[in-house]
Design a protein with these regions (language model features):
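Non-heme di-metal
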Residues: 2-160
Length: 160
């Protein structure tokens, strides 16, 4: 599903929100995996950041689920959405280092929300959920993802 064009229907918006939910699940799982696998070697500041990133992703997922529930649209089974996320947004496994992987995750999420907002703003469709409320929630999530990109960049620079 492309975000290059405006959102054309409630169904498409529902599917895009579902993609965001799965994307947040991926980000949360990868952060938690890094904490578990790198437990002994992980810098306490990096561990704290990864734990916060996982919590933030869970919060974003909850906000997206609330928006999805407010739409009067058919949804697609999550098992059908997951491959779309993996294909387009999931990080490759060849990143060397926890922080590089987390940077990719944060940037990917930021870019997804930036594209989603543009696709909604360029759409003429009337959604069952208030457009201002919808874009406000998504803009806040996008801003939090941008802050995550900035924070992981700072952590990387501190370790150079």
């Amino acid at each position: 599903m492309s975000l290059a064009r405006p959102v054309g229907s409630d169904h498409q918006l529902a599917r895009l929100l579902q993609i965001g939910i799965v994307l947040e699940e991926v980000v949360e799982a990868r952060a938690e995996k890094h904490v578990e696998l790198s437990d002994a070697d992980l810098d306490p500041e990096v561990r704290a950041f990864l734990n916060e990133a996982a919590e933030e992703s869970a919060d974003h997922r909850a906000r997206l689920e609330t928006l999805l529930a407010e739409l009067d649209a058919d949804t697609v089974a999550f098992e059908d959405i997951e491959p779309l996320v993996a294909e387009r947004y999931e990080a490759d496994d060849d990143f060397d280092g926890v922080l590089y992987d987390q940077l990719c995750n944060e940037e990917t999420a930021y870019k997804f929300y930036e594209d989603l907002l543009a696709a909604i703003e360029n759409s003429g469709v009337q959604f069952p959920v208030d457009r201002e409320y919808l874009t406000s929630v998504l803009a806040k999530i996008m801003a939090e993802e941008k802050a995550g990109v900035e924070r992981v960049t700072e952590l990387m620079e501190e370790r150079e």
